[in-house]
């Protein structure tokens, strides 16, 4: 009795009337779909690729486990270059390492450089083959040298919309120079007609 009295009082205070019976509404009105949340997005090879590229500054292991196969191969900067690997230890082919390769590389890059602006200028795909390129700015944490480099990346995506092969390229001559001492120079002999270049 007291319960119904309180309900009646609350209804009168907020201006609600009794609910109409279901049969009082003509037609069939299905409930609307729930609003899209941050984890609700249409998965396509291109959108998966973009998600992985954009998680570089703050690697999300759970997201990467979801979007990268356990045996994915990551080719970073070069197939195999011991000199480059000595400067940037993540350079080389990481065969069948899976999401852990992404975590290790993305994290280590952040330890070596202070990341600046990163842009995806173009991205597109042909079924499971996707590619993108853009530019980024980075400042070496050891010497404080800032460089701007173009980058390009390619991925192969399976029918489950998971990346199983990933390749990243950049202007390594420029990015490696951010770790070069001003007191060190290297002589390059490239022109067949003679002459040298110093860097």
From Swiss-Prot:
EC number: 1.-.-.-
Keywords: Cytoplasm, Glycoprotein, Oxidoreductase, Signal
Localisation: Cytoplasm, Cytosol
Deletion consequences: Completely abolishes the production of patulin, shows reduced sporulation, and leads to the production of a distinct dark-red pigment.
Any one GO molecular function term: polyketide synthase activity
GO cellular component: cytosol
Pathway involvement of the protein, from the record: Mycotoxin biosynthesis; patulin biosynthesis
Signal peptide (from-to): 1-21
Coiled coil: none
Keyword hit for Signal: yes
GO biological process: patulin biosynthetic process
Induction: Expression is correlated with the production of patulin. Expression is positively regulated by the secondary metabolism regulator laeA. Expression is strongly decreased with increased sucrose concentrations. This decrease is lost in the presence of malic acid. Expression is increased with pH changes from 2.5 to 3.5 in the presence of a limiting concentration of sucrose, 50 mM. Natural phenols present in apple fruits such as chlorogenic acid or the flavonoid epicatechin modulate patulin biosynthesis.
Glycan-bearing residues: 129, 183
InterPro entries, sorted: NTF2-like_dom_sf (IPR032710)
Domain of life of the organism encoding this protein: Eukaryota
Biotechnological relevance of this protein: Patulin was originally used as an antibiotic and specifically trialed to be used against the common cold, but it is no longer used for that purpose since it has been shown to induce immunological, neurological and gastrointestinal effects. Genotoxic effects of patulin with dose-dependent increase in DNA strand breaks in brain, liver and kidneys have been detected in mice. However, more recently, it has been proposed that patulin might also have anti-tumor properties.
Function: Part of the gene cluster that mediates the biosynthesis of patulin, an acetate-derived tetraketide mycotoxin produced by several fungal species that shows antimicrobial properties against several bacteria. PatF catalyzes the conversion of phyllostine into neopatulin. The pathway begins with the synthesis of 6-methylsalicylic acid by the polyketide synthase (PKS) patK via condensation of acetate and malonate units. The 6-methylsalicylic acid decarboxylase patG then catalyzes the decarboxylation of 6-methylsalicylic acid to yield m-cresol (also known as 3-methylphenol).
Entry's family note: Belongs to the patF family.
Protein name: Patulin biosynthesis cluster protein F
Organism of this sequence: Penicillium expansum
